[in-house]
Structures are given as C-alpha cells and as structure tokens.
Regions:
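Membrane-lumen/periplasm interface segments of specific transmembrane helices
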Residues: 23, 145, 153-157, 162-256
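Aromatic- and kink-enriched transmembrane "portal" helix at the membrane-lumen/periplasm boundary
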Residues: 30, 48, 55, 62, ...
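Transmembrane-helix motifs of polytopic, lipid-linked glycan transferases
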Residues: 53-74
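Transmembrane alpha-helix segments characteristic
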Residues: 257-276
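Hydrophobic/aromatic-rich transmembrane helices and adjacent perimembrane loops
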Residues: 282-303
Length: 314
C-alpha cells in the first residue's frame, strides 16, 4: 500500500493537513492527522511513519471488524473469510488508482465496528466511536443507514398493507437511535466545517464528468485518472474490474446470500446518490463502504452455495 500509492494533489498533502492549511474538503477529515501529530510529539517518529502506523492499526482493526460484521449478519460465516476483504481493497486502492489519503482505510474499520457494536448493544462504545469516526470522514452517516436497514421490522399482517403507524410502533427505539445518530452526525460535521471555515477551497470537490469518462472508456481514450490507455491499468476500460470483479458473485449467488446480509445493500442507493453529487465516480477509492458491503454479500453467497452443494453430495 505504501509502495504503490501516492499523494497526487498538493493542497491535500500530509504536510498541508498537519499544518491545518489543506483545502476544506480534505482538512475536515482531521482525525488521522491529529493522531499522527500526537504520535510525533510523544514518540519522536516522523509524520510519515506515524501515518503509516495509523494505517497498519486501521488494517488490523478492519480485519477484526469485518469478521465481526460477517458473524453478525451471516449465520454460518466461513473461517478466515474476513481476509477476502483484502482483494477488492488492494485492487481499488492500489492497482486501479493508487491515490493515498490517510483517512481512507480507517473509515472502513469504523464502518464495520460501528455496525458490530450497535448490533451487540454496546451503545456507549458505539456512540463514542460514532463521534470519533465523524472526525475521520463524514461517511459515518452510512453506519446509521446500514443499521436502519438491518434492524427495521415491518408489520407482517398483510403483504398489501404497510401502515406507517405500525411501522413507527414496531421500530420506536430504532427510530430514536437513528434520529440521535443523525443529530450527532450533523453536530460533528458542522463543528469541523466551522473550525476550518477559513481554509482555502470548498467543502466539496468540483467533480469530473462521469459521462465523459464513460465515453472515453468506450473509445479507449485517456481519461483521468487513467492516462496511459496503451496499458491495461492505465486504460479507462479497466474500470469495469471495480472491486476486483467480485461484485459479479452477488447476482450469481443471490439466492444463497443470507437475508440479513442482503439488507446491507440498501446502503447502495443513498451512497451512490451522494457519490454522484460530491465524488469523482471514476476514482475507485471513493467506493469505500461499498467494498465492505459487496464483499460481505459475495462471501456469504459463495459460502452458502458451497454448503448447499456439499449437502447434496453427502
């Protein structure tokens, strides 16, 4: 990861982040740089080494968090399947783009652990993590959406009637929690933006045209961030290999994907809507939490298919 990724944009470098002079859109994701600067002061390490230490710890936390997520959403998770998250992450973050931001990997660990802690009813730890994670990246809102999708209970008296009053009655505690999380998210987000209101730039990036990118990909022409179309990884057509292609296993093994795991896919529509508005969709590192969701569905589907096949042959 450290050898094959790079900081491509000068207003977002680690040095600028550490000086709190980076553009707003990057500086508001301040957690890792604060931790790194504190590590530098306490240990004498360089900023680069401190950031790498944060990244290593985040990777370990991600593996344990993803294992916990699989256990909470899948009744029969395969042993060691948490390591498969490395496949789409290595492909999206290293092979396809190689653009480094210190807050990318921590956001995935926070997403997994946020869901796990809430499902285990460790609410005090959950809200502490939620507040801290909001300093790392504003995508903590997708933890709330995932929890709502996983825990929502629907009235089952009639498949033709879905009365709102009964939905509220059945899910009063969940709605209170999600409302509280939403309020906390807005408080943390607006507080950070207020602190760095004097930084240059805007709070959201000006995005490149995805339509133009797809047109260039169809024609095989160079298009940012794929600028050497004569090579495989430099050709925009390789974008189709997003998530290392494991997304294809989700529809292929859909009937075997555990029902609880399927619910995580409800995060996809609001996630993609936000990405369309505020992110460069051709930049594969922006599909952060979707790596977790796609991999969980693929792993669950393949494992349950294998178990069903094994039962038939026994």
């Amino acid at each position: 990861y450290f050898l094959f990724t790079h900081e491509y944009y000068e207003p977002a470098t680690s040095e600028r982040m550490a000086d709190f002079t980076a553009d707003k859109v990057f500086q508001k994701r301040v957690l890792t740089i604060i931790l790194a600067k504190s590590t530098v002061i306490l240990t004498g390490l360089s900023l680069d080494h401190a950031l790498k230490a944060c990244c290593v710890i985040s990777c370990i936390a991600l593996l344990y968090g993803f294992r916990g997520l699989l256990r909470e959403t899948n009744p029969n998770p395969a042993a060691g399947s948490e390591f498969l998250i490395i496949v789409p992450l290595a492909w999206n973050y290293i092979a396809l783009n190689g653009i480094y931001h210190s807050y990318d990997l921590p956001s995935l660990a926070f997403f997994c652990w946020g869901i796990v802690l809430f499902l285990r009813r460790r609410y005090a730890w959950f809200y502490l993590l939620y507040a801290i994670a909001s300093l790392n990246r504003e995508s903590t809102c997708f933890i709330t959406i995932a929890l709502f999708a996983l825990l929502l209970r629907a009235p089952t008296k009639s498949i033709h009637v879905f009365p709102l009053r009964e939905v509220v009655k059945y899910n009063r505690l969940l709605i209170l929690h999600c409302t509280g999380q939403t309020v906390l998210w807005f408080i943390m987000k607006n507080s950070v933006e207020y602190v760095f209101r004097g930084n240059p730039g805007n709070y959201y990036e000006k995005t490149f045209s995805m339509y133009k990118f797809l047109g260039d990909a169809w024609a095989g022409k160079a298009s940012w961030p794929y600028l050497t179309p004569e090579t495989f990884l430099g050709n925009p057509r390789c974008f189709i290999t997003l998530f290392a292609g494991i997304w294809i296993f989700v529809p292929l093994f859909w009937q075997f994907v555990p029902e609880q795991t399927k619910k995580l896919l409800w995060v996809a529509p609001p996630y993609l809507f936000g990405a369309i508005l505020f992110a460069n969709l051709m930049e594969t590192r922006v599909y952060h939490e979707m790596n977790i969701i796609i991999t969980a569905c693929a792993v669950g589907g393949i494992h349950e298919w294998w178990r069903a096949r094994h039962k038939k042959t026994c």
